[in-house]
């Protein structure tokens, strides 16, 4: 047979180099997406010795979901609301700013926090952006996903996986919503 015959099967083996290029490409998406991910914690005047020793904090991951002109709105777990009166949000550049709770839903376990835009430094403003949210109705089993934030119980985690299910419905006292399941492992208290 002549070289390059159209009937020859195409070698679809994924080489180590191909795999590394895929991971590098995915990490470029991670670096951009991280600009919209924050850490929300209860403000404390006491030092958190446990967090300093272990790297594990009592913060939750959040997503910058909107800019209403006056403040940035951040969607996160409401678990940091318990017994707290003040909150802080740490942005991707490592700076922290005072936050307030705009809305809290104990049934779903989520809250919306806000940070005044006029408090942000120019450096922070240039380092962040409002997350681009997709359409969950278009998510399909087998689609690739990336989880960011407190995915494994510590801050600044990155995990890759696929959507394993789009059929699950979570029931709450006041309704239900669809849940997109992934094969990304988590840990107790993870909020990425």
Language model: regions and residue ranges:
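Catalytic-histidine neighborhood of serine endopeptidases
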Residues: 67-109, 117-118
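Active-site substrate-binding loop(s) of clan PA
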Residues: 28, 64, 100-102, 120-154
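Short, conserved beta-turn/loop elements at beta-strand boundaries and strand-helix junctions
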Residues: 45, 57, 67-69, 82-83, ...
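A conserved glycine-rich beta-strand in the N-terminal activation segment of trypsin-fold
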Residues: 18-28, 44-76, 96-98, 130-132, ...
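Active-site region of chymotrypsin-like
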Residues: 117-131, 159-192
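Short conserved beta-strand and strand-loop elements enriched in small hydrophobics
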Residues: 40, 85-93, 143-150
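N-terminal targeting leaders that route proteins to membranes or the secretory/organellar pathways
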Residues: 1-49, 56, 86, 120-121
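Terminal peptide-recognition signature
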Residues: 35-40, 62, 71-76, 99, ...
């Amino acid at each position: 047979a002549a070289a390059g015959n159209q009937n020859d099967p195409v070698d679809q083996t994924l080489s180590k180099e191909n795999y590394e290029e895929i991971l590098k490409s995915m990490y470029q998406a991670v670096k951009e997406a991280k600009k919209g991910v924050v850490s929300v914690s209860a403000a404390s005047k006491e030092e958190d010795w446990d967090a300093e020793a272990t790297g594990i904090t009592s913060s939750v991951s959040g997503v910058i979901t909107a800019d209403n002109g006056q403040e940035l709105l951040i969607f996160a777990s409401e678990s940091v609301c318990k017994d707290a009166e003040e909150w802080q949000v740490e942005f991707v550049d490592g700076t922290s700013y005072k936050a307030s709770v705009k809305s809290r839903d104990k049934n779903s376990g989520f809250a919306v926090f806000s940070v005044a835009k006029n408090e942000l430094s120019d450096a922070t403003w240039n380092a962040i952006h409002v997350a681009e949210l997709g359409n969950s109705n278009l998510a399909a089993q087998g689609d690739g996903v990336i989880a960011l934030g407190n995915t494994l119980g510590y801050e600044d985690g990155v995990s890759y996986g696929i959507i394993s299910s789009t059929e699950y419905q979570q029931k709450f006292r006041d309704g239900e919503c669809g849940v997109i399941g992934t094969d990304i492992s988590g840990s107790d208290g993870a909020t990425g």
